[in-house]
Design a protein with these regions (language model features):
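Cytosolic catalytic domains that perform sulfur/thiol-centered chemistry
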Residues: 1-172
């Protein structure tokens, strides 16, 4: 993620869990959006996942080297594009905990056999700005803000330019 000023691929090349495949959240997000890490188009997702060699019935464990921010976003991408939720997991504690527990890591990058992944977007999982605006006026669903308490309360600046601080009305 850009605001961390880290290079995920460089970190992956240095050490990762054996047989792990690198997923670049920045590169694999919508390019023509002013908002960060928006979902790509279906055909783009199919190309991304096919190049990773992942098949529709593969069980997937996702981890990252942060506070699970990237892995949760990656997890949601797979769920949104129709991968069976029972087959998608986030590694508890991520790479940090894995290493703290003195588990094996490697710098070997395996050769990937390209697959032919077919996505089935679950569009009902995403709400747009219009839905949120309507919910502010007439509450129909819960809105949960997963940012830090300080960001939710507007006590600290947003890490990305152009985003206002504070919460959306009717959010928790």
């Amino acid at each position: 993620m850009p605001q961390t000023k880290r290079n995920g691929f460089a970190e992956y090349k240095t050490q990762h869990i054996q047989n792990a495949i690198f997923f670049d959240l920045d590169k694999n997000s919508k390019k023509d959006s002013s908002l960060p890490h928006m979902l790509v188009e279906v055909d783009d997702w199919e190309k991304i996942v096919s190049k990773m060699g992942i098949k529709k019935n593969d069980e997937i464990v996702i981890y990252d080297n942060s506070d699970v921010i990237s892995s949760c976003r990656c997890w949601f991408n797979f769920i949104f594009f129709g991968h069976d939720p029972k087959l998608i997991h986030v590694l508890n504690g991520g790479l940090k905990k894995w290493i703290e527990e003195k588990r094996k890591v490697t710098n070997i990058i395996n050769k990937i056999e390209v697959s032919n992944y077919k996505a089935h977007p679950q569009k009902k999982l995403v709400k747009n700005k219009i839905s949120i605006d309507q919910n502010i006026e007439e509450k129909r669903f819960e809105v949960i803000d997963a940012r830090s308490k300080e960001r939710f309360e507007g006590k600290v600046s947003e890490p990305r330019k152009g985003l206002r601080s504070g919460s959306i009305k009717n959010s928790y």
